[in-house]
Structure formats: structure tokens, C-alpha cells
Amino acid sequence: MSIGGSLDVGGHIPIPSADALAHSQRLVAMIEASIRAERGGLAFDRFMEAALYAPGLGYYAAGARKFGPEGDFVTAPEIGSLFGQCVGQQVAGIFEELGHGVLLEAGPGTGRLMADVLEALTILGALPDTVLLLETSPELRERQQALLRQRLPDYVARVTWLSEWPSDGFEGVVLANEVLDAMPVKRFRVAAGQPLIAHVIHEASGFGWDWHDADTGSATRLIERYGLPDDYTTEVNERAPAWIRDLGRRLHRGVLLLIDYGFPGNEYYHPDRRDGTLMCHYRHHAHGDPFSYPGLQDITAHVDFSAIAEAGAESGLRVAGFSSQAGFLLSLGLLERAEAMSDAMAAARQVKYLTLPSEMGELFKVMALSRGIKQPLEGFSLSDRTSAL
């Protein structure tokens, strides 16, 4: 997701190049074929999945640069090393109690977070036995490997890349920075107290919405739980809780550290949030049209952290902490680390973007789900909002 200081919200998005438009049209043709095969329209989560992950064509599967100033958005690790240093401090504390274990990152992006964390762990004398990177994109794997070879040449041989979770259970720490928000979501609208599920159809003017009175049960439960009124439109992420439950069964002991933008359930489904949280990003422009340039733009939705906590509990994980990103980083000595930097302006810039409410500090949350960990986690020593879940 883009951060506030470099994000243009609304307005006209840039026009892609001819080659990029041709690429998008190939994906559009594939999605049109899927819509014709369905006859009644394509469920929105399947449209979103194709737009993001269709092999060779989807946004995350096509190889174009996504991260940083030349991409579509900036993530916290790309701002500078302070974020990864603080995360490394927390990881070291967990390994101190575990005594051994695996460090696994899901969706490592450019590899910057893992590189910063490993450098911090080197200084702290807390390098793990094994490092695993769960990455399905061949292009991103290459970028991660190149970065780690450059920054940790003596350690990279101990890093293994995976395309799926380890088959056996394990102990250790799992990092997931901006992973859940990229999972396809179902979109629904409330009518006469019941959910209408969003489908995508193709008309002469392009893709459009169609609404079906079918439900898997999750939307109905949300309507009942939060008293959602008629004409309320929002999303439900059914895949993120399933992802948490699957990981929870494999993590025999340790901590899952989730960093993402979102809210507790009662804030996510607040009566005033009547159009949900669906957001698209293209060349640092944010807008709400998921049908614009399929395959060229990111499509995201915020995280319902109450649902994540409940999914963790179902697989035996407890919430070991829940905080804003600002609270988490400040608990781990962000300001002291910034003061020690030689470049005061760069340090101030990082602190600003990572902690200010108008930037990433408040919208981004950190949740720790743990099993078999007794010591309180340092990252939640200044602020813990678990009771808000």
C-alpha cells in the first residue's frame, strides 16, 4: 500500500504505455472467457484473484516492478532500515525464549524486510537456525535472492525459498507484512436485511457489477453481528482466516507477527463505513475502480483483525499483542535508533512515515498470535489494544 506522503488519492490515474495496455487486454480477454463460462457473472473474489494472480498476466504474477518510487506503492521496509531493525529486535526476543527455530517470511516482496531483520539479528547474536521465504513469484524470488546475496553473502546459503507452507510442523517466528490485504475478498451489499453477493459481468462498455442473492454464510453473520443496514456495501475476506488456521496447525510453538492496514471488526463494519475499504493503486495513485486496467494495478481491502484473532483461536493461537504500528515500533526503540543515525533528515523522514497518524502510524496495525510463548512481547509494552478486538 502507498503511504500518505507519496499517494495521490482520487483524480485521474496515469495512462499506461501501449505495451502495458496490450498486456492488460490479454488479461481482460481471459477474464471475459471466464465470465462467459459462468453465464451468470464471475464472483468478485474470483475476478480479483485473476486480476492479481493469473499466471503471467495478473498484477503480482507478471513481473512488472511494484514496490518503491518507480512502482505503484511503498511498503514500510522500503522507507529505510529502521522498520526492519525494530522488527528484528522483537524477533530476537522471541528466539531468546524459544532457544532455536525457523524464521519464515510470507510474501517477502523485494526481500528488504528480511535483509534488515537478518542484519539486526546478526548484531544481536540471534541468527536463527533456518530462514525460509514463502514466495510464489519467480521474478520476486530473483530480486530477493540478489538482495540477500549482496547484503548477507555469508548467510544466504542458509536461506530456502518455498512455494507453500512447510509440510511438517515447526517452531519459530513467522513474519507477514502486508500479506492479508492482498488476498481476494467477497464483496456484498445489504438489501432487506440479506446479503447480495457482487459478481462481475462484461458489457459493451466494459466490466460492471451484478448482485446475486447467494451467500456462503459469512456475509449473513456479519450483517447479524454488526447490525449492518440496507444499502451498506462492504467486503468479507474468507481466505485470510483460512490462511491463519492452516498456519496455526503447523506452528507448534512460536509467534506469527502480522503487520497490515485494517481495523477491529466493530471499526471495519462501522455504520459510517458504507462503501467498504476496497482500494486500488496504480503509479502511486489510489482510487476505487477495480475494473481499471486489470493486471496493471493493485487491488486491496483492509484487514478485519477481529476475524483474524478468532481464526487464530480456532487453531490454538492466542493474541499476544495488538497495537498500532506506531505503538509497536516506539516500544522497540524506534526513536533511540533514529537518534543514533548519522543522517538526521533521513531518520526524521523514516520516523514521520512510520509513526504519524496521517501516514502509516495509526492505520497500520501489528498483531502477534502465539503458541507456547510465556514472556510478554516487547513490541506491545507501550500500547496493547487487544481488548478492542
Short names for language-model regions:
Residues 173-221, 271-281:
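A mobile, often basic/glycine-rich helix-loop segment
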Residues 60, 182-185, 267, 376-378:
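Short helix/loop capping segments that flank catalytic or ligand/cofactor-binding pockets
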Residues 165-192, 234-238, 242, 246-257:
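A short SAM/SAH-binding and catalytic strip from SAM-dependent methyltransferases
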Residues 217-389:
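Long, Lys/Arg- and hydrophobic-enriched amphipathic alpha-helices
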Residues 2-106, 110-170, 327-330, 336, ...:
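Rossmann-like AdoMet
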Residues 106, 136, 179-182, 261:
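Generic detector of well-ordered alpha-helical packing
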Residues 115, 143, 184-186, 268-269:
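Short glycine-/acidic-enriched loop or helix-start segments at secondary-structure transitions
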Residues 51, 174, 308:
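A residue-level signal for conserved active-site and pocket-lining positions in enzyme catalytic cores
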